[in-house]
Regions:
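Amphipathic alpha-helical packing segments from all-alpha helical-bundle domains
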Residues: 101-146
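C-terminal peripheral helix-coil segments that are non-catalytic and often amphipathic
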Residues: 150-172
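Short amphipathic alpha-helical segment with a characteristic S/N-K-E followed by hydrophobic residues
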Residues: 12, 27, 39, 50-55
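Basic, helix-initiating cap at the start of DNA-binding domains
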Residues: 1-23, 27, 32
Length: 172
């Protein structure tokens, strides 16, 4: 990628993240991103069709490597990895998760349903097999989202291994 294009995209992305933390997604306008990134409107739209497209790229960046190539990992290792990734990207994750952004939550929930639920169900929910699967999926996914939300709001940080233990104990 051309360095000028990469620099422009970084400026737009950084402005988006700053505004996400300052204003929240719902109160942010494309014009706010343009002003903070110090780019022209046509430049913004040359790279992104909308603020939704920018959010989509952010979600892709956050989730892409999380669940790819981890099929063989055990549940605890996978969860610790995810929590570490969320801590590393706390500025992005916290803003989106705590704002309850619908797109972000849908993307996160889809990834969790596909990649986390089967492992958790296999290892920790054997005694709950007589319950409807869609209820179990909903329970695991919402418990995960709420656990991460709680964790991101804590003043005294809990390490990822301890958080993994808390999450698994909630499910057992």
């Amino acid at each position: 990628m051309d360095r000028r294009i990469a620099k422009t995209k970084r400026a737009i992305f950084q402005a988006f993240l700053t505004l996400l933390n300052d204003k929240g997604y719902d109160h942010m306008r494309v014009q706010d991103v343009i002003d903070l990134a110090d780019v022209g409107r046509s430049t913004f739209y040359a790279h992104y069709a909308s603020k939704e497209a920018l959010l989509e790229e952010l979600c892709h960046d956050l989730f892409h490597h999380l669940f790819t190539g981890r099929e063989d990992a055990d549940v605890k290792t996978l969860l610790v990895h995810i929590f570490k990734h969320f801590r590393t990207n706390q500025d992005r994750v916290a803003s989106l998760l705590l704002s309850r952004n619908a797109y972000f939550l849908r993307e996160l929930e889809a990834e969790l349903k596909h990649d986390i639920f089967p492992k958790v169900a296999e290892d920790y929910m054997q005694d709950k097999r007589n319950l409807p699967e869609d209820l179990l999926v909903h329970f695991v996914v919402t418990t995960f989202v709420e656990t991460v939300s709680w964790w991101l709001q804590q003043r005294k940080k809990v390490d990822e291994a301890t958080l993994t233990d808390y999450f698994i104990r909630l499910l057992a």
